[in-house]
Amino acid sequence: MTHPIRKTHPVIKIMNTALIDLPAPINISAWWNFGFLLGMCLSIQIFTGLFLSMHYIPHIDLAFSSVSHICRDVNFGWLLRVLHANGGSMFFICLYIHIARGIYYSSFHLYFTWMTGVVLLILVMATAFLGYVLPWGQMSFWGATVITNLISAVPYVGSMMVQWLWGGFSVDNATLTRFFTLHFILPFVVLAMVAIHLLFLHQTGSNNPLGLNSNAEKIPFHPYFTIKDLFGVVVMVWLLMILVLSGPYLLSDPDNFIPANPLVTPTHIQPEWYFLFAYAILRSIPNKLGGVVALLASVVILIILPLYKNKFMSSSFYPLNQMLFWGFISIFILLTWIGAQAIEEPFYTSAQILTSLYFFYFILSPLLSVLWDYVME
């Protein structure tokens, strides 16, 4: 009896074990769609970014004009540009939901998968920040100046590191050129990390909503979950196209339609909306070094989650943790909103309270799990 080529061909069988004959838990819900959607988002970003880079000019005198040229003169250039910009927003929506699902269902106990995921998050955030600088509008320039200047808070070597990063004594042409180079290369590094992320995931198998061992009853990924994931893709693409075709600049900053001017500071400097929660945490600390540490901690704190020990994987069995988790999501949304506001009352005090609560979640969550395990005994 001849075996299908997908099971014998050296290259195709790798794809087969990852996407077709992959044993998947029978009870995974729609929350497990987002990994596939992130793959779709990454594909869209690389594809649109590749074509945009053919027309973009990484020079401070020409960058803004080249983006304008792409939107006005290149065939469907406007579509490529807004797809790339809003595709980034869709990427982060899927990314944050993917992480939230991992926290809720305790997927962080898949240690290597979780750690590579945190590295991926940092890489994607770095890539998005570098891309925000490239149009060379007012917010691009001042965002780059403010955020990169935070490195000067590093004791002893901070100022030297900033000058090394800028390629001079201010954000200038050298900065733009290296940011473009890094923005071009990092998505391919992300792609390689995704392969490693999947490699570790397929060593252990996926978690499931009950958090139980599902080795006894798994089903092939295709056709069951390919159909389920394709439905998610259709919904995501539909939402993305509504955003792109009816409100393409809804999530971008009006200041970025003004060419970069080092002599005029915008009234309110802020990053893209998906970084606002971290930006609010940064601004809530009155000390520069403390703010930078809090900013880094807001993302890097995810690496401590595998240290948590609880008897059940899923938060479905921990009512107190469920309430705490949804409170944490509310805090995240409120921090995002406050990050877009001016640094004045009541936002400043609110940000400080919410920052404390944000970090308090990671202390209180394992304690509540232990308490509930004790009560249930």
UniProtKB/Swiss-Prot annotation:
User: What's its membrane topology?
Assistant: Multi-pass membrane protein
Give the record's keywords alphabetically: Electron transport, Heme, Iron, Membrane, Metal-binding, Mitochondrion, Mitochondrion inner membrane, Respiratory chain, Transmembrane, Transmembrane helix, Transport, Ubiquinone
Please tell me whether the keyword Transmembrane is annotated for this protein. Answer: yes
Task: Give the Gene Ontology MF terms in alphabetical order.
Answer: metal ion binding; ubiquinol-cytochrome-c reductase activity
Where, in this chain's numbering, is heme b b566 bound? H98, H197
Report which superkingdom the organism of origin falls in: Eukaryota
The record lists heme b b562 as bound by: H84, H183
What does the subunit comment say?
The main subunits of complex b-c1 are: cytochrome b, cytochrome c1 and the Rieske protein.
Please tell me where a ubiquinone binds in this chain: H202
Q: Name one GO biological process term.
A: mitochondrial electron transport, ubiquinol to cytochrome c
Instruction: Tell me the lineage of the source organism.
Output: Eukaryota, Metazoa, Ecdysozoa, Scalidophora, Priapulida
Pfam families recorded for this chain?
Cytochrom_B_C, Cytochrome_B
Similarity section: Belongs to the cytochrome b family.
Localization, per the record, is: Mitochondrion inner membrane
TM helices/strands, residue ranges: 34-54, 78-100, 113-133, 179-199, 225-245, 288-308, 323-343, 352-372
> What is this protein's name?
Cytochrome b
Listed under GO cellular component are: mitochondrial inner membrane; respiratory chain complex III
Recorded source organism is: Priapulus caudatus (Priapulid worm)
Please give the PANTHER family that the UniProt record associates with this protein. Answer: CYTOCHROME B (PTHR19271:SF16)
- Names of required cofactors: heme b
Q: Which free-text remark accompanies the cofactor?
A: Binds 2 heme b groups non-covalently.
Q: What does this protein do?
A: Component of the ubiquinol-cytochrome c reductase complex (complex III or cytochrome b-c1 complex) that is part of the mitochondrial respiratory chain. The b-c1 complex mediates electron transfer from ubiquinol to cytochrome c. Contributes to the generation of a proton gradient across the mitochondrial membrane that is then used for ATP synthesis.
Q: Main site of residence?
A: mitochondrion
